[in-house]
Amino acid sequence: MSGGSEVVRLNESKRELFENAASLDGIFSPKSVALVHTGLPEAPGADAISTFLNGGFQGTSFVIQPGSSPAPGTRTYARLSDVPCKVDLAVAVTSAEAAPAVVADFVQHNVKGVVLLSPRLGTHDAYSPEAAAQMRSILGSSRTRVIGPGALGVMSPLLGLNATAGLPMAMGGTVAFVCESPLLGRVVLDWSLKHLVGFSSFACVGSMLDVSWANLIDYFGQDPNTRTIALQISSAGNARSLISAAREVSLNKPIIVIKAGLDGHAARAFTWKSRCQSSDSQVLTAALERVGVIEVDGINDLFYTADALSKQPRPRGPRLMLVSNADGPGVLAADSLARAGVELASPSEETRSQVQQLLREENTLDDVLGDGSAENYVAVAKLAVNDPNCDGVLLLLVPWALADPELTAAMLLELRNSSKPILISYLGAADTGSAQEALIRACIPTFSSPEVAGRVFQSMWRYSYELQALYETPVLHAEGDFQTHDFVYQLIVQARSSGRSSLSPEESAEVLARYGIATCGPNVAAVPDRNGVLAKLGLRVDPQFGAVLMFGSVDRGPGVYGDVAIGLPPLNAILARRMLEKSAFYRGLLREYQTGSLRALEEFLVRFSHIASDQPLIEEFEVEGLISPSDVLAISSRCKLHAPHTKSEDLPRPAIRPYPVQYVSPWRMKNGQTVTMRPIRAEDEPLMVKFHEALSDHSVYMRYFQRVKLSTRTAHQRLSRVCFLDYDREFALLAEVRDPHSDDRRIVAVATLVKSPQKSEGEVAVLISDDCQRQGLGKELVRRLIGFARDEGLSRVVASTMFDNFGMSVVFERLGFQLSTDFEEQLVNATLSLDS
């Protein structure tokens, strides 16, 4: 192609996503607030006004109070229309019945954010589906965002904003906390004030009519004042958007959820058949864990974990080394931690030798007595931190006559820059307040007991561990496996067209066999005589999260199956192992068999997950398998289909979108060389580094409109996000060539499509290697992205290119784009409508 580099500006900043997050600025960062008193009897309107006025809000505030005398010290108006300036946030105490009219007034006056407080504190104000539908219709395409109805309110302590129903102002901090339950919100606030825990934002959202979990997670993910996000989730709402947002944000900020719902005893009482009839807490837990969210058991662990993750490095492994200055407490702490499942690290021989030389007596790390000096204790602590056998250190300090807590704390500050997490527990520490304060100021967390510290360390490790799995991109098919999909799909379609809602035993066995799962056919009597353990694998369709996988032991009781591990498809071997590890039954198998012997079970689960992702017309699939040291054999199966009258568009969508292998295909460039066009994967990062290394300065300048260092373009933090995409938000298609002699792969072009928050528009961008420009790649990549946009239901595609990039302007024109010129920005803007 003639003229310029075949480069289109890539929207790396994800401008649309940021604008979506910024839509909540009117709620959490308003410049003007109107407090609307609706005059409901027994409503806490006066308390809300008083609380707000005493909060020290830094912006402008008004009171809307029809037919009443002005509140002291306020600017009071009878109507919202009387306010002389634009209102960012309106706070109203209103019943569910009155809410539609109140919201309509706010929308009419272009209020950015609305908080609808409940007139009855501590309760959700029930409202009819008709009222909810009416409010959604009123909101329509407006820019007004609503928290509530039935909310307890929101706070932004750093701004002095207290838009709640009479709650005291929270302390400022770095944790954003959001809950649904008003009662839990009050408990958390009281706890935080008692324990001096601060918030960047605090919100009790009530009935989430408008603002969703995804909106909130996106917002706090971009909030510079928030380091950690803490949530209490009772209902997931739009599960796919929740998982999508959590997946995006958890890479950079920890998201911690208070465990709620079924306890272990209640979960075990569920029958296998009823397990996934609705979204119980275990399904929600499995979904959140899949995207790197941490779940904890209570308020203490929630904020202790949030604090530790914001101050300490994440552990690289599960091994925690205990260092104590007293023998009895040290032994008791070690026993307690071991019972809690903490993996205690054993010091290396070199560390043991150095400790003996230092103390010159028979001491161990859990009994560092020596002469009781702070110097000895800190010296041993340094040895523990540097020991290669540990991933974190818990320092247990017991005040005793010969010890100086303040001096010990001062010397321990030398460990503040450790690459491993350092946690400290003071026992019986009535007189160590100043020592603990010094450590806390130095970002070294202290705990009242080693058990709490151990749980926090486990949560920190789980966060690191789950983040590793985020970069796993399961591939649904290898090339050539589409025949399997088509065969099974036709089998299911024929069964449904004949009015059946289930497959026969022979057909169920055929489905398993087609996906590479060994079976003994429909005849259970044909099971070979071999040693093994029976296990149950299941597939259920959850109304919110789509297909859900289950694995557990076969219980010969009255239809009850205990110890069920739950996961979401699709899986690869690593993700399958992560799912299996949640089962005590599987951990028992590990003790009985060698780890390598259970690879067949992982492969079995991976293939079974492909069925779940590949065949959405299946509603339930149960398989009883025989696990032996060498393989897994399906000995019986039952497959239930969605009812014949159920339309495909009415089926629940999967929470985790699989790798879109349907967009993989070869293509020939003008020079005759064949490239493979495929969606980008997380493991493409090394190839992307080489791709950027080969770009000329001119191409880089045309791409970024400025000179950008190679080190900036190839930084891991940037490229990992480019390669690790959520296909519900962004799509990247690359062109890859293979060396016929070495079989080495090389990326020669990358094209992206970034969806708008409303999923109505996609912005296209293309970047092509210098040696492959003018080969037709730009046109073909854009053509394929247009096809993807149509498949996703987008209404239009837009792009921008520089004035002198004539080649891409021609490409856009030939593909049907309408071109316009932006002389101020020196750009050609291209728009293609997909509605026709």
Give residue ranges: language-model regions.
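Long, contiguous binding/interaction regions
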Residues: 643-836
